[in-house]
Amino acid sequence: MRKSIAIIGGSIAGLSAALFFASAKNEELDFDITVFDEGKADLKAAAIYNVPFFPKGAKADEIYTHIKAQIASMLEVKYIDSKVVSISGEKGDFTVNDEQGLGIKADYIIVATGANKSDIKELEDFVIPHELIPKPNKFCFKHHGRQIIKEGIYAAGLASGVTTMVACAMGSANEAACAMGSANEAACAILSDIKGAVSVYHDTPTTRN
């Protein structure tokens, strides 16, 4: 079985979701992953000191390069440097349209566009103020259940209403609800929907031997 996933937003949340799907690929389930990104992520203005496993003071490009290399070792992903302007269709038959006129088909969509206001057509009615970021003009998507904006479309990262772009649920020193964690939750929710039962994926030391 092969499922297509469009990820709108290629910063830490979007790439974390792509990495989850890459690791979950097996003989029974494969993925076509397309990541759209405008290149305007807030992470580009940050240096990361509070997340384990990243080099101290890691910058956005260093983080992106590392995650993309990890993804590429398991799955070929298509990256498109473009803004998504509209979504049409329904779960299992979406079309994601970008500003260049490209239309990508997808079974599922993850929206990880950060906290700036989204003007993606068909999602306008779901945009609400982001109440956990103490800055003006910050927004997220109204969602329910497992970060479902509407059937087949999931919010991740700041767009899901969490308060930090990078830090994970690793204790009181970091935010419990976070971009990478919410992205993996969205990916787990999609995997569960595909399999028809609550599903997660973890490797063991011998999984890939």
Question: Each predicted region: which residue ranges?
Answer:
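FAD-binding beta-loop-beta segment adjacent to the flavin cofactor pocket
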Residues: 132-153
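Beta1-alpha1 glycine-rich phosphate/pyrophosphate-binding loop at the start
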Residues: 5-62
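Glycine/serine-rich loop-strand microenvironments at binding/catalytic pocket rims
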Residues: 1-7, 75-82, 100-109, 113, ...
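A conserved FAD-binding loop/helix module that cradles the flavin
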Residues: 25, 152, 156-207
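Short secondary-structure boundary/capping segments
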Residues: 40-43, 101, 144-147
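Glycine-rich beta-alpha-beta "Rossmann" dinucleotide-binding loop(s) and their flanking helix/strand
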Residues: 107-138
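N-terminal Rossmann-like dinucleotide/flavin-binding domain of flavoprotein oxidoreductases
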Residues: 46-103
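Glycine-rich nucleotide phosphate-binding loop and flanking beta-alpha elements
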Residues: 14, 116-119, 162
